[in-house]
Amino acid sequence: METSLSRRTLLGMAAAVPLSAALSACGSSSPGQGGGGATYWYLSGQPQEGVRAGAVDAFNKANPETQIKDTTFQNDAYKTKIKTALGAGQAPTIIWGWGGGTLRSYVEADQVEDLTSWFDEHSEVKDRLLPASFGAATVDGRIYAMPCENVQPIVLFYNREVFDRVGVEPPESWDDIMALVPRFNAEGIAPFSLGGQSRWTNMMWLEFLFDRIGGPEVFQAVIEGEKDAWSHPDAITALTRVQDLVKADGFIKGFSSVTADSNADQALLYTGRAAMMLHGAWSYGIQKAEGGDFVSSGKLGFMNFPPVEGGKGDPGNGVGNPAQYLSVSSRASAEEKKIAKDFFATGVLQDDEVKKWIDNGSVPVRLGTEKLLAASDSADFLQLTYGIASNAKTFVQSWDQALSPTAAETLLDNIAKLFQLSISPKQFATNLNAVIGK
């Protein structure tokens, strides 16, 4: 599983580098608008890279006169490279991304094409995609990106074998979670695995607690720039609840030294050292690939995050990545823009690509895939993922993607401190209020 899907955010990277260095990559094409055809940058790493490349190859074979030249980049370099290229006016025609706050920064700098009228004229393209996928593609009511690839909700995973051994049931509420903590600790099993060194893994807990306690309106107020939004009473309650879990030894000892990018947190679950793990849907593929017979023998359980007693949020709501996104550079030529849009219409999420995503344990953001999902050897998990994505009244984008890069980095720094108990919920709120709208 590529780290782009397990490490969704690329925040806090080195500042600008020389353009010649920033534009070096794994592929063979050159950026910018020269040499004919369109250009497309995306992340390397199998099996996702192979699916993306296959879609480009299929489009090029069907359109020999209008080629797309693709270039791959390692995950940890991509954000800096694309930012540098956009600033220099040398971006590729098609820009791969996560939508949300980063897309807004592109829009405000007039670096990407407004696709609203194109989608109006090509309603058949929009109508084949999950409606929830368009939220992170939209800025101030206008669409600036084509949703693509797969939906990645955050899921509560658990080790069925460990639960059976301890004689307990999966949690149906927050109180159940807190009651399970001493039961597992008494058996020498960590209640929850957590790759806390990576910071964004901690964030998933707050995303769900904010939603389940206060509903989506609490974080939406942050997005809308409402003054002191982080100090909302329900936000303080959510921040307090997660510290209650830390104080109760709810997480693996030394979680702040465990990294998610190395999949160390995944190993804690499938080896039985931890009973549960809150993580992205991509974890299923990692567990399947690295956990021996853990998945095939039915030992991996999964569910949406349970409700919090007295909470205002709908327990069917989801959080995570509603899709990945393709934008068109505003600096591209008219010919290049046409090729990109033709690719969106006839090359993205076609039948072969959809099948490949499903075979890799992912749920594509195309509607009407229920039969393919049901026929997969991962049907139970894929149907859970599809159900969350298609039935959620609200699907909140991962906070570090929804916010601006500046606010997101402050968020991640303070989340780490919150989990280390080095700041209080009120201090967290004060620190985050200072970067609202920045």
Predicted region positions:
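Hinge/lid segment of periplasmic solute-binding proteins
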Residues: 100-154
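Glycine-centered hinge/linker elements that transmit conformational signals in sensory
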Residues: 181, 224-256
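Short helix-initiation/N-cap motifs at beta->coil->alpha
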Residues: 72-81, 174-179, 255-267
